[in-house]
Every structure is written in C-alpha cells, then in structure tokens.
C-alpha cells in the first residue's frame, strides 16, 4: 500500500513538472504579440525583421526609434541617405502591390485612409498588416510608443518622446503672457479657398498655442471636417489680426484661386491683416500634413509669425 501511494505521488509530480515545462515552452515560443494604438489592438510579429512601410510619415517615426524598414513611398522631399536607399513602392496612395509582395515582408505598416484598399490582398497573402488612423499632431506620441514596442526599442521611444514633449512645452510656455491673437487659417488649393477647423493640422497647432481661430465662431457644435466654406464677406466681418494661408497644389493654380476668391476683391485690401502685412503663406511640408517630429519647429514658426517670439531647441 505504501509503495502504491509513493508511486502515485511520484506520478503526479512528474505530470505537474511536464505540464510546467510545456507551459514555459509555449510562452517562450510565441511568435506574435498584441499592441494598441489609439484604442485599436493589433496582432503583430513578436520580433519583425522585414517591415514594409507604405507611408513616409510612419517611416520617419519608425527610424526615430531606431527601427528599420525594407521600403518607402515615392517623394520629392529630401530624405536621409539611409531612407533614400530603400526601395520605393510608388506614390503613397498608389502602391505597386506586385513589388510589395515581392519583398516578402513579415509586417506591413500603412495608413487607413490611403491603404485600406490593399488590405484584403495582403491578408490573402498571409502578411500581417497594421493600418494606422494616424493624422493629427495628437497622434505623434501614441505612434512613437507603438513603434517602440513593435521594435522592442521602448527605451529609445521614451527618450524621443521626452525630447518631443519638452520642446512642445517650451514653445507653449513662450506664449503664456501674450494676448491671444485672432487668426484665420485659410486652405488654398487650385479648386478654391476654404478655412481650417481645429481638426486640421495648422488650426490644431494654432489652438495649442492659445490663439483664437475665428472660424470656430461660425461652427455649430462639433465637426470632423478639416475645412469648411469661408467667404471673403465672412473674413471681412471677422477681420482677424493674422491670416495664415496653407497651400496645396501648383503655385499658379493656387494664385489664381486666391485671386478669384479673395485678393482681387477691393475688400481684401481693407482687412487689418493685409494692411499690417500679416498675411503669411506657410509651407505645405510642415503645415498641410502632420509634421511629426517637426511639430515643435512648426509651432515655433507660428509663434514667430504671430508674436515675433523666437524659440530655439
């Protein structure tokens, strides 16, 4: 009886030991992990080695946390030599899928608003894909955090975030004692002129700096629209201190649109901002789309134009 009892105990101990070993092996051999960006959870490779990137805005953030990629999108912007050397897959909104699939990536990073149309084809080829809803400056820190966790470079991401947030704070602190400027942010394209809401990049930076966006007084409730119709008549009634103009498209087409909608009308010359030479045309590179890690520099530019205050980093 005693031998039988001892044998049973030994058998139980062996089973438990084997179960424990099995559990450890399963955990250590996991090939995926779950990461979250802005409330959305994604399943990604545990240690991706071949990351194909379809958006250069995401690419710059990836390299900021010491990540590496195997592709980029076409661009006319000057890139660092390391990024320039990457295979270009076509325009951001028109990716060459044959070339992308040929890279044999173990993860693809893109944007919901540009690359959703490719998702089913990537899934059919069993390629893990993350499509970010990455748009405004509020998304920059979450993006750095996500990419740091993705590449297992969390400490680098934290360091970059600390510098980024410190520079943002430095710009905002410089304006604390200023009377808020009344600002209109116009969006000029070849098709016409509209006004930016706080959902747009430049207007969101204006808000962060405590300036008053005059278009806000014309909006009923909240809106997800980045731009809204805005006439010269309304602009004349608002008569802001400063007019920021964000451009998109060819210069000659933009000039023509501005003349038709605004500058050829005699009322334009009567605007306070025009008379005080405070109509500022902003470069699209920093002010049309999310400037990413250059957000502090973009905000410092707005601060300089509005208040004459220089902030350096």
Q: Residues of each region from the PLM?
A:
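Structured C-terminal subdomain patch of bacterial secreted/periplasmic proteins
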Residues: 149, 242-313
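Alpha-helical, coiled-coil/dimerization segments enriched in small aliphatic residues
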Residues: 75-78, 194-226
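Extracytoplasmic ligand-binding site segments that recognize negatively charged/polar headgroups
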Residues: 117, 133-146, 184-205, 250-253
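Flexible loop/hinge segments that line or gate small-molecule binding clefts
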Residues: 79-82, 118-150, 280
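Bacterial Sec-exported substrate-binding components of ABC uptake systems
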Residues: 2-8, 19-57, 155-186, 247, ...
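A short, structured surface patch at a secondary-structure boundary
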Residues: 53-103, 107, 112, 214
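Proline-aspartate-enriched helix->loop->beta-strand connector
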Residues: 97-99, 104-110, 127, 232-245
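Short helix-initiation/N-cap motifs at beta->coil->alpha
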Residues: 36-38, 87-98, 220-231
């Amino acid at each position: 009886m005693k031998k039988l009892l001892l044998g049973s105990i030994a058998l139980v101990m062996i089973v438990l030991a084997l179960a424990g070993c099995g559990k450890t092996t399963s955990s250590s051999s996991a090939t995926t992990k779950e990461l979250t960006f802005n409330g959305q959870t994604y399943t990604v490779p545990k240690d991706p080695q071949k990351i194909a990137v379809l958006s250069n805005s995401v690419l710059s953030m990836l390299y900021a946390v010491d990540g590496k990629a195997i592709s980029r999108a076409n661009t006319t912007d000057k890139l660092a030599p390391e990024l320039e050397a990457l295979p270009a897959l076509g325009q951001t909104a028109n990716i060459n899928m044959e070339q992308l699939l040929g890279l044999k990536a173990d993860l693809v990073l893109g944007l919901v608003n540009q690359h959703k149309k490719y998702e089913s084809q990537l899934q059919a080829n069993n390629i893990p894909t993350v499509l970010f809803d990455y748009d405004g400056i509020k998304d920059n820190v979450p993006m750095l955090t996500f990419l740091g966790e993705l590449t297992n470079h969390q400490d680098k991401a934290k360091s970059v975030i600390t510098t980024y947030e410190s520079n943002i704070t430095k710009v905002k602190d410089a304006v604390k004692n200023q009377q808020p400027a009344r600002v209109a942010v116009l969006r000029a394209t070849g098709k016409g002129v509209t006004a930016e809401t706080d959902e747009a990049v430049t207007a969101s930076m204006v808000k962060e700096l405590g300036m008053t966006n005059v278009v806000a007084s014309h909006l009923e409730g909240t809106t997800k629209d980045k731009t809204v119709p805005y006439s010269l008549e309304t602009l004349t009634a608002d008569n802001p201190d400063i007019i920021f103009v964000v451009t998109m498209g060819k210069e000659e087409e933009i000039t023509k649109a501005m003349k038709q909608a605004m500058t050829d009308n005699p009322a334009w010359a009567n605007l306070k901002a025009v008379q005080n030479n405070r109509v500022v045309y902003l470069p699209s590179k920093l002010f049309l789309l999310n400037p990413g890690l250059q957000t502090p520099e973009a905000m410092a530019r707005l601060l300089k134009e509005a208040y004459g205050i220089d902030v350096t980093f």
